[in-house]
């Protein structure tokens, strides 16, 4: 068993002002994605002035934060937030939904694309390779918060999390997700997108890979207490949301390549 590193969730405290690691991880993720996007933006939109990428990052960040929080409220714990709406603003305590954040990003990106005369799907293909940076940073934030831990296990790398009332050795599922949704997904998308691909192929690959990775990790992750398992004694809300994501992503890839083949000269 590995010891859980005792990390104060508050990274910086200046008087009554507290800056939490959870929030810092989101800033690091957004900043890292911004920097990587700046390396490729000229290939995607050579006509853009320098501040246009900043505008895009702002819109995407708003989609992540607002969509992620509202998605968690709607998908995972609606009753609690209806009873105490002020909890919605307490984002430093955790409670962000990837699928809600994805919906928020899609909506904000659609608005941005319309305003700037860009194809929505081409914009999604540009954004997709940078998303794992934010996902990975967010999972580290979950780990520091000692939340979203896994099931009890006897694997050598199991950990006892201080927030676990049972104090059992558990899978560090946040680190599994960091490795898959952050590192592995970034490598796959970064390498795949180095060459021109059919429209929707890169974003479709993101949807497929994320959905598969998340579906797998959910088997060792403890479901949200207020929901539990939805069916069969193992199906979680995260898995339910990933199934249409994988199917849609596969359809996007197939459609993109079929459309590209139809354009090829005979």
Curated annotation (Swiss-Prot):
Keywords: Cell inner membrane, Cell membrane, Membrane, Transferase, Transmembrane, Transmembrane helix. Pathway: Protein modification; lipoprotein biosynthesis (diacylglyceryl transfer). It comes from the Bacteria. One of its GO terms (molecular function) is phosphatidylglycerol-prolipoprotein diacylglyceryl transferase activity. It is an enzyme of class 2 (transferase). A 1,2-diacyl-sn-glycero-3-phospho-(1'-sn-glycerol) binds at residue 139. One of its GO terms (biological process) is lipoprotein biosynthetic process. PROSITE patterns: LGT. Its main location: membrane. It is found in: Cell inner membrane. It is a multi-pass membrane protein. One of its GO terms (cellular component) is plasma membrane. Its EC number is 2.5.1.145. The chain crosses the membrane at residues 10-30, 56-76, 87-107, 120-140, 172-192, 200-220, 230-250. Belongs to the Lgt family. Catalyzes the transfer of the diacylglyceryl group from phosphatidylglycerol to the sulfhydryl group of the N-terminal cysteine of a prolipoprotein, the first step in the formation of mature lipoproteins. This is Phosphatidylglycerol--prolipoprotein diacylglyceryl transferase. It comes from Stutzerimonas stutzeri (strain A1501). The lineage of its organism: Bacteria, Pseudomonadati, Pseudomonadota, Gammaproteobacteria, Pseudomonadales.
